[in-house]
């Protein structure tokens, strides 16, 4: 399933950017309190609504980071399931929709190291921020991720 991810934060950044959905302006929300950087390009999927009331979050595996506000066509391959102080905050994992990535079709095709890196980042990136917390509950496969995506589309339309 092909999706479009609007990247807010490039891989390797400690800047937490947010795009204003009404104006399209990119704002610096904060500089991460922890000495950690985003493990992959990170953004959201338009016309979806996650359990936290924001568009569904997504990470993209690609060979080179892009700039904030760039839209990347990618394929859903899995989901990191988590909650934070605002409730459910799942992160879809996707891969660049490019034939050079045809060998990655499901979460089982992603290295354990990369999954561990992503999980560690999201479980700990808010550790030094008062009143914030994250609980990770593991990985889901492509089918589960696509179901979460479909539910987020329905939630947006409701």
UniProtKB/Swiss-Prot annotation:
Binding site for Mg(2+) 3: 84, 89
Subcellular localization, as worded in the UniProt entry: Cytoplasm
Name of the protein in question: Inorganic pyrophosphatase
SUPFAM superfamilies, alphabetized: Inorganic pyrophosphatase
Entry's family note: Belongs to the PPase family.
Binding positions (Mg(2+) 2): 8, 57
Cofactor: Mg(2+)
Organism of this sequence: Corynebacterium glutamicum (strain ATCC 13032 / DSM 20300 / JCM 1318 / BCRC 11384 / CCUG 27702 / LMG 3730 / NBRC 12168 / NCIMB 10025 / NRRL B-2784 / 534)
First-listed, main subcellular location of the protein, grouped into a coarse class: cytoplasm
Active site (catalytic residues): 89
GO cellular-component term (any): cytoplasm
PROSITE patterns: PPASE
Ligand binding (substrate): 16, 30, 42, 125
Keyword annotations from UniProtKB, A to Z: Cytoplasm, Hydrolase, Magnesium, Metal-binding
Role noted for this protein: Catalyzes the hydrolysis of inorganic pyrophosphate (PPi) forming two phosphate ions.
């Amino acid at each position: 399933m092909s999706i479009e991810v609007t990247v807010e934060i490039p891989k390797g950044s400690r800047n937490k950017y947010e795009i204003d959905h009404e104006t399209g302006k990119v704002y610096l929300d904060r500089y991460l309190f922890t000495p950690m950087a985003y493990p992959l390009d990170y953004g959201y999927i338009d016309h979806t609504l996650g359990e936290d009331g924001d568009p569904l979050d997504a990470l993209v595996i690609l060979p080179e980071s892009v700039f904030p506000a760039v839209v990347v066509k990618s394929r859903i391959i899995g989901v990191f399931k988590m909650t934070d102080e605002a409730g459910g905050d799942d992160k879809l994992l996707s891969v660049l929709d490019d034939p050079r990535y045809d060998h990655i079709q499901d979460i089982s095709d992603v290295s354990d190291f990369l999954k561990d890196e992503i999980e560690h980042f999201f479980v700990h990136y808010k550790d030094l921020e008062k009143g914030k917390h994250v609980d990770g509950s593991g990985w889901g496969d492509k089918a589960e991720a696509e179901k979460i995506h479909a539910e987020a589309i329905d939630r947006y339309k409701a």
